[in-house]
């Protein structure tokens, strides 16, 4: 049977995501009459009368007062250099209505392509709002369009906005105040409110300890509205931390003393661990002063999201921050770094060089309290000096000879290559397997046989059980809940060294990251890669070198890998497993193929664009040929081992569209077909197919009917053939849905036909939908073809509150079996510089979240399994392909298993068919011993050898500094300088201080 149970976190239905935001302006400059008169280079003008006001400020000390005398006579905030909001989804603004009547107003965004004629409304986006009488409200403007009353120009570009207009929609004169314009492009799901104990801290070296908060320091000067106390609830160092309750906005803490950090290095930063265990985001600001500052210094800021714990740091040189993933990958070759900068982009004030030998104050203060809150609390711990992560020097020699973090020590770090070589045999001797399943890993007590997908399966099938739950069915006829691990191969363990195939493109920064480059498993011409500072050049696999040191050969590694899967209770080798493992004869596997890339592929017409690439034209004859070539490749890979073949994935995370943006990305790929030339049938088979469908199935009455629906003026069907850029209009929606379905159906059906020709009666598992790349139309088309639907789901669970209620409803309505191709959680306590797509606070938290996710999947009637991505941690210095540097493995880069993860997996996998497996918990006294359910002795056993030494101890902390006069923190809004040009690894990055 399928077990119906949920963890407490899922059953409690975690809060919906909260928004993170970046400040654009809060109008703190004195003069906005011209962009030349203020450091933000903004201009406020227009037909309405506007002025800077100290009344009704919602962020900082000032707002803009706008006096409107008639409808559609605007006040406009201009940025003539334009804002790039391409990565954002929402612009928000605080509006104060001091009048006794409600006021309806409009916001209109203008992009720079409207120049020079100022008449093309397609370059604008307009929406309407109502602010209630005598209230302050925050309004959100959808940068992608789609609101009920929004007019979103088909050519509007959110990455080049030059103007934000505010205007009345009625003629009654009114006064409104505007403040705190922000943009928002990401969300965070807060964890349960009970918080975590001993949460993570950034794995970077401490140069000097400032404060560990075991007690409240006597040199701390809190403002009158701040209450401080020690806490043990959230601790990153020692046994206690400091909780600071802020009872009013712009309250702060001042650590006052004298510190000498001049000898710690040229580029350093002050770091502190901060936790926000509330339901509201908090803006936190910092100021660092020296003996000469006299209260005049730059303010830098960061958003601490609801439920978030992280390390933040303030650069003592004010080096520019790499705030986006694209910037980090481009400059460093790393997707993420382990701490968040207090940045100039989120602060204000000109930086003045500090005398690091005479630092006198460290200040932290918050912005406004969240709406409706009377106080907000942050927990501070482990304040120290670190190398400045904004500067290249922080990454020098970050890896040791085994590719481990060379800056700190941590649990599971291997002490030396000599110790690594001793670890394989003891682990092999401890491994066993679960006893409560059949030879395939199925449930011997369940034999589903209703509504089976395949009439005569060659190996695995999918059927319903007596309770109406979908189940995979193994060759023995038993229910099989597929749990497994992806990417069991060496290909993605390579990292770029910085040596380029083109000497002019080498990265000295990348080269500085390594203390030693192994001589084996080196690819001198890796690439071209997806992204990074070196597009093609030398790459090395530390993991592959380590497995040879640990196990002596790849054959032994493959053997122990399969034995680990059995020991941990996994019954499937997940996607992108090395085909050499297919013949293992013990653990079933999934195979995979690529429809358009690989050897002997013919060129195929490409449609539109996407994160991983455009879509292939499925009507192109070469596409069918390539699919057949792919199917033959898969057949050759699985030949002789078909019995253990669970099913076949083809392609991955294709960019079909996005459900959140009807007028934009939802139908962008479908509309892109019309931008291809169909005048020759061979030039765009997709275009000709679309025209045929429209003429013969949608508009059989003639072209005039299409013109009426689409607002076009085609003289004939032939006139639709040339390439043209069509903008979405509401009259197209039903046609777009129909055509998107046809496109996807042709793709899935062509692939399925090729697979069934070579591998009949094996399960086709689809293409692994990403949340950002699927629409209901495409899902429906896939369901008409594939045997088992597949999704990659990076959420805390598949519960509606965590994932997608609409997607779940569609799955249940379609009533197909579903498998999850990818999910994971990552943490920083393994020495990694990045957690993963979904974060955890520790290895224990990773394990707990993994089990909760699996429980949610196992409890749903349609879901038949889930595979963890991935087997091996990303390289510490980033995956060669795209800089991915996550702690998401079941093993580290020394091939050391994460014991907390493997123990949790074993206990869940043992119990997923209904057995009480609590005796396998690593909390039991006889945890490592064999028993009735498990033949191994591996529970609670670490395979990392003796503890690795600490690379270096920090400088002794100074004696508590003398007590200077008490100082207060003054509030301020978001004024900022215009541009800062600084170097990072020889690459000059032009950085805007605000969005």
Swiss-Prot record:
Job of this protein: Hydrolyzes agarose and also neoagarotetraose to yield neoagarobiose.
InterPro entries the UniProt entry points to: Agarase_CBM, Glycoside_hydrolase_SF
Catalytic activity: Hydrolysis of (1->4)-beta-D-galactosidic linkages in agarose, giving the tetramer as the predominant product
Signal sequence residues: 1-20
Statement: the UniProt record of this protein carries the keyword Lipid metabolism: no
Annotated keywords: Glycosidase, Hydrolase, Signal
Superkingdom of origin: Bacteria
Region (Disordered): 936-972
Bias-annotated ranges (Pro residues): 948-965
Gene: agaA
GO molecular function, one term: beta-agarase activity
Pfam families: Agarase_CBM
Name of the protein this chain belongs to: Beta-agarase A
Protein's UniProt keywords contain Disulfide bond: no
Family: Belongs to the glycosyl hydrolase 50 family.
SUPFAM superfamilies reported for this sequence: (Trans)glycosidases
EC assignment: 3.2.1.81
């Amino acid at each position: 049977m399928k077990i119906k149970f949920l963890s407490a976190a899922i059953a409690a239905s975690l809060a919906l995501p909260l928004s993170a935001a970046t400040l654009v302006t809060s109008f703190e400059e004195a003069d906005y009459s011209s962009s030349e008169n203020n450091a933000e280079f903004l201009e406020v003008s227009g037909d309405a009368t506007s002025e800077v006001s100290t009344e009704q400020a919602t962020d900082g000390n000032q707002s803009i007062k706008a006096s409107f005398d008639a409808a559609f006579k605007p006040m406009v905030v201009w940025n003539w250099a334009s804002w790039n909001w391409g990565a954002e989804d929402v612009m928000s603004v605080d509006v104060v209505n001091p009048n006794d009547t409600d006021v309806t107003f409009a916001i209109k965004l203008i992009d720079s392509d409207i120049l020079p004629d100022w008449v093309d409304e397609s370059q604008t986006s307009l929406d309407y709002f109502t602010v209630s009488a005598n209230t302050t409200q925050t309004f959100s403007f959808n940068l992608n369009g789609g609101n009920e009353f929004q007019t979103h120009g088909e050519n509007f570009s959110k990455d080049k906005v030059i103007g934000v207009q505010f205007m009345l929609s009625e003629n009654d004169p009114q006064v409104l105040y505007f403040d705190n314009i922000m943009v928002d492009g990401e969300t965070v799901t807060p964890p349960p409110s009970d918080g975590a104990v001993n949460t993570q801290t950034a794995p970077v070296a401490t140069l000097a300890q400032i404060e560990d908060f075991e007690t409240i320091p006597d040199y701390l000067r809190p403002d009158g509205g701040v209450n401080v106390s020690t806490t043990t609830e959230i601790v990153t160092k020692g046994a206690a931390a400091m909780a600071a309750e802020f009872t009013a906005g712009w309250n702060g803490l001042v650590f006052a003393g004298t510190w000498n950090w001049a000898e710690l290095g040229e580029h350093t930063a002050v770091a502190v661990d901060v936790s926000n265990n509330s339901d509201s985001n908090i803006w936190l600001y910092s100021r660092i002063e020296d003996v000469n500052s006299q209260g005049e210094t730059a303010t830098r800021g960061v958003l601490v999201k609801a439920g978030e714990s992280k390390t933040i740091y303030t650069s003592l040189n004010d080096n520019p921050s790499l705030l986006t993933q694209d910037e980090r990958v481009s400059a460093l070759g790393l997707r993420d770094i382990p701490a968040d900068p207090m940045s100039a982009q989120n602060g204000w004030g000109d930086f003045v060089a500090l005398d690091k030998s005479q630092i006198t104050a460290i200040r932290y203060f918050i912005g406004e309290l969240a709406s409706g809150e009377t106080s907000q609390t942050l927990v501070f711990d482990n304040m120290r000096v670190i190398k400045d992560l904004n500067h290249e020097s922080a990454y020098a020699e970050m890896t040791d000879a085994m590719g481990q973090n060379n800056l700190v020590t941590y649990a599971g770090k291997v002490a030396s290559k000599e110790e690594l070589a001793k670890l394989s045999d003891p682990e092999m001797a401890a491994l066993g397997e679960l006893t409560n399943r059949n030879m395939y890993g199925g449930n011997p007590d369940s034999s589903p046989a209703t509504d089976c997908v395949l009439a005569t399966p060659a190996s695995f099938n999918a059927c319903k059980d007596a309770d109406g739950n979908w189940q995979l069915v193994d060759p023995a006829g038993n229910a099989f809940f597929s749990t497994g691990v992806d990417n069991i191969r060496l290909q993605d363990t390579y990292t770029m060294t910085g040596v380029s195939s083109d000497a002019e493109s080498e990265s000295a920064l990348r080269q500085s990251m390594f203390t030693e480059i192994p001589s084996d498993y080196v690819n001198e011409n890796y690439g071209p890669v997806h992204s990074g500072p070196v597009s093609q050049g030398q790459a090395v696999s530390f993991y592959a070198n380590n497995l040879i040191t640990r196990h002596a050969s790849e054959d032994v590694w493959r053997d122990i890998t399969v034995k680990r899967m059995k020991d941990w209770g996994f019954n499937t080798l997940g996607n992108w497993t090395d085909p050499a493992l297919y013949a293992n004869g013990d653990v079933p596997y999934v195979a995979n193929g690529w429809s358009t890339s690989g050897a002997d592929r013919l060129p195929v017409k490409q449609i539109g664009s996407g994160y991983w690439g455009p879509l292939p034209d499925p009507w192109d004859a070469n596409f069918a040929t390539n699919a057949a070539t792919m199917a033959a490749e898969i057949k050759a890979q699985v030949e002789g081992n078909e019995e253990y073949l669970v099913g076949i994935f083809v392609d991955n995370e294709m960019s079909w569209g996005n459900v959140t943006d009807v007028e934009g990305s939802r139908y962008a790929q479908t509309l892109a077909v019309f931008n291809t030339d169909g005048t020759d049938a061979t030039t765009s088979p997709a275009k000709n197919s679309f025209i045929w469908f429209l003429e013969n199935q949608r508009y059989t009455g003639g072209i005039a009917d299409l013109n009426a629906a689409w607002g076009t003026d085609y003289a004939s069907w032939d006139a639709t053939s040339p390439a043209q850029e069509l903008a979405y209009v509401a009259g197209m929606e039903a046609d777009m849905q129909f055509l998107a379905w046809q496109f996807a159906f042709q793709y899935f059906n062509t692939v399925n036909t090729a697979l069934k020709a070579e591998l009949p009666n094996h399960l086709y598992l689809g293409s692994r939908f990403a949340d950002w790349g699927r629409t209901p139309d495409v899902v429906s088309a896939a369901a008409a073809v594939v045997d088992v639907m597949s999704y990659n789901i990076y959420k805390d669970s598949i519960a509606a509150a965590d994932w997608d209620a609409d997607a779940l409803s569609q799955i249940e309505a379609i009533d197909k079996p579903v498998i999850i191709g990818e999910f994971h959680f990552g943490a920083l306590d393994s020495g990694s510089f990045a957690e993963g797509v979904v974060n955890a606070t520790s290895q224990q938290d990773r394990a707990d979240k993994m089990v909760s996710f699996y429980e949610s999947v196992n409890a749903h009637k349609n879901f038949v399994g889930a595979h963890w991505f991935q087997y091996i941690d990303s390289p510490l210095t980033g995956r060669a392909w795209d800089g991915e540097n996550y702690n998401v493995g079941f093993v580290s880069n020394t091939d050391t298993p994460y014991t907390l993860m493997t123990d949790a997996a074993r206990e869940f996998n043992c119990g997923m068919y209904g057995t009480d497996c609590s005796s396998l918990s690593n909390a039991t006294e006889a945890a490592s011993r064999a028993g009735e359910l498990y033949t191994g002795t591996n529970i609670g056993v670490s395979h990392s050898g003796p503890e690795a030494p600490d690379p270096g101890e920090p400088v002794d902390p100074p004696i508590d500094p003398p007590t200077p006069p008490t100082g207060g923190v003054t509030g301020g809004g978001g004024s900022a300088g215009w541009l800062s040009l600084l170097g990072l690894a020889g690459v000059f990055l032009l950085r805007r201080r605000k969005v």
